A protein has these predicted regions:
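Short coil-to-beta-strand
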Residues: 132-141, 174-181
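RNase H catalytic domain
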Residues: 167-229
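C-terminal reverse transcriptase regions that engage the nucleic-acid substrate
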Residues: 2-112
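Acidic carboxylate-rich catalytic motifs and surrounding loops in phosphoryl-/glycosyl-chemistry enzymes
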Residues: 1-9, 123, 216-230
């Protein structure tokens, strides 16, 4: 007699239909930790090894939903590299990414199959080139002028900084923030969990997500507004 199973392992993932969760198997998690420790000891790895390691991290996303936030600076090391045997020395940002997989990945290696129900909060933000920034939600308005050191930043940085400030001001615990911005570029960087050729914008996206996750919430883009031209 065949008994139905409530737990299935496939490609390093364990699917549990009783608990409604997906987890990395112990073997897969231990392998990632071992590879990370090895790279840390050497201060880097070859291009081929880095590509293989990043492939393992990408494959973990079903169980570790915030995985992308913790490999973008390692991913950036691939840019311009072609020789599989070339040794790539990790910079400080990449080392921080790597350390997260050693210290914290296991704690995040199980995720619910259904997203938790969170109260929704819509926030609309805007950033002016020279004047300042602002935003509003059902909780009211927030606005300020740029500081002198911020005035000469790129407009995409300003759009993301405006979003960060408004989220920090308006968001409460366990809310799903839906944010609307003017910049398509900034929208894509936030949605992709910090995928960008710019290290500055990657860092800004990480700061935004840090606020969201520290409040046990989530973030999605509610589209972007195309600027009107006269």
């Amino acid at each position: 007699m065949i008994e139905p199973t409530r737990e299935v392992e496939h490609l390093g993932l364990r699917w549990n239909t009783k608990k409604m969760t997906v987890s990395l198997t112990e073997k897969r998690m231990a392998n990632i930790e071992e590879k990370a420790e090895n790279i840390k000891r050497r201060g880097g790895c070859t291009l081929k090894e880095l590509q293989s390691f990043l492939g393992k991290l990408e494959a973990s996303r079903a169980a570790i939903v915030i995985a992308r936030l913790h490999f973008r600076f390692m991913q950036a090391l691939l840019r311009g590299k072609e020789d599989d045997k070339e040794f790539i020395k990790f910079n400080e940002k990449a080392k921080i990414d790597l350390q997260w997989w050693i210290d914290f990945a296991r704690k995040h290696s199980t995720s619910p199959l259904q997203a938790p129900r969170l109260a929704k909060l819509n926030i609309k933000t805007d950033a002016s080139g020279d004047a300042g920034w602002g935003g509003h939600s059902r909780r009211g308005w927030t606005q300020a002028r740029w500081e002198r050191k911020e005035k000469h930043k790129h407009i995409n940085w300003k759009e993301m900084e405006a979003a960060k400030k408004c989220i920090a001001e308006h968001m409460k615990s366990r809310e799903h923030v839906q944010i609307e911005m003017d910049s398509l570029t900034s929208t894509c960087i936030i949605n992709s969990m910090a995928r960008s050729t710019s290290a500055t914008l990657r860092q800004k996206a990480l700061e935004i997500w840090e606020i969201i996750l520290s409040n046990q919430g989530w973030l999605t883009q509610n589209g972007y507004r195309k600027r009107r031209t006269k």
